[in-house]
Amino acid sequence: MSAQPVDLQIFGRSLRVNCPPEQRDALNQAAEDLNQRLQDLKERTRVTNTEQLVFIAALNISYELTQEKAKTRDYASSMEQRIRMLQQTIEQALLEQGRISERPGSKFE
């Protein structure tokens, strides 16, 4: 589907962006989240310059995204290691039961 214009209010400013209809709810939620972050940041820091607040919020969001990506990579690596260990355990159990023959290239990869 084609993108359609969506009007947003962020930190007292109007913004019109194009967005696919199926992503409209997520966009509105993101705008609400950004609005709340900016308001919280303004109250915590006493910074009144909107541009500075936006940059600080962007840095915070970027940092959070970087942390989440690292967690995802670590989790994926951990799962890959567990899968390999499980695969080796299964192969060893089958070998011990004589169900598969031990020969090069017989690994399940």
From Swiss-Prot:
Its main location: cytoplasm. Keywords: Cell cycle, Cell division, Coiled coil, Cytoplasm, Septation. It is found in: Cytoplasm. GO terms for cellular component: cell division site; cell septum; cytosol; plasma membrane. It comes from the Bacteria. Residues 21-99 form a coiled coil. InterPro entries: Cell_div_ZapA-like (IPR007838), Cell_div_ZapA-like_sf (IPR036192), Cell_div_ZapA_eubact (IPR023771), Cell_div_ZapA_N (IPR042233). GO terms for biological process: division septum assembly; FtsZ-dependent cytokinesis; septin ring assembly. Belongs to the ZapA family. Type 1 subfamily. Homodimer. Interacts with FtsZ. HAMAP family: ZapA_type1. Activator of cell division through the inhibition of FtsZ GTPase activity, therefore promoting FtsZ assembly into bundles of protofilaments necessary for the formation of the division Z ring. It is recruited early at mid-cell but it is not essential for cell division. This is Cell division protein ZapA.
